[in-house]
Amino acid sequence: MIDQTAFIHPSSIVEDGAIIGAGVHIGPFCYIGSQVEIGAGTVLKSHVVVNGVTKIGRDNEIYQFTSIGEVNQDLKYAGEPTRVEIGDRNRIRESVTIHRGTSQGGGLTKVGSDNLLMINTHIAHDCVVGNRCILANNATLGGHVSVDDFAIIGGMTAVHQFCIIGAHVMVGGCSGVAQDVPPYVVAQGNHATPFGLNIEGLKRRGFEKETLHAIRNAYKLLYRSGKTLDEVKPEIEALAAEHPAVQAFTDFFARSTRGIIR
């Protein structure tokens, strides 16, 4: 179903069954598969491929040579009906690739809203990217990676499969991330190690001084106390009882499966 207010360039192909919302603009030489849904106001500049069972929300900007919803690169994949879901108001720049999920990983690759995916970003099967994240040029997420809200991943950085990048994290460019990065942390290097807290980013997002002080105390317990993670968990939990922002650390520890960067 194609809304009558949508524009589709004559050189583009939209297969029967695709759902194209109001005000969608599909530029030249695009291909839209039969199981694709594109929400109102989304713009495909040119030479964009959207395939598979893929749902794209409203008011996204998708630039040329991007591929969304194609078959993933997991050798175990045997054509199962897996999906891609993308939220609203994302800017997806040139040559980005977002692959469909696998049955082993829950069947869904998901990108939230208000993200900036710069040139040549790769989001592999079963990844979950939150809201208001920035992935700089050539950032690469392996399969099953989670990137939480407000995270920034620098250019040419690779994240190992199954890793978690916590909320408000900043990972420097040309890094290799092989373990989980706790919330609020700045990480850099190959393998990535912690370099303090993303204080400037937190200030810009309205974190108050008292909250920043509590986050600093949690960071010091985690990285400067000389104690193991199991030893500092109760202390961080006690701090979280007084300062809700610290709860992000305890929630993160419960999700972590690869260990945290050191």
Swiss-Prot record:
CDD domains: LbH_UDP-GlcNAc_AT. It is found in: Cytoplasm. One of its GO terms (molecular function) is acyl-[acyl-carrier-protein]-UDP-N-acetylglucosamine O-acyltransferase activity. It comes from the Bacteria. GO terms for cellular component: cytoplasm; membrane. Its main location: cytoplasm. Pathway: Glycolipid biosynthesis; lipid IV(A) biosynthesis; lipid IV(A) from (3R)-3-hydroxytetradecanoyl-[acyl-carrier-protein] and UDP-N-acetyl-alpha-D-glucosamine: step 1/6. Homotrimer. NCBIfam families: lipid_A_lpxA, PRK05289.1. Involved in the biosynthesis of lipid A, a phosphorylated glycolipid that anchors the lipopolysaccharide to the outer membrane of the cell. This is Acyl-[acyl-carrier-protein]--UDP-N-acetylglucosamine O-acyltransferase.
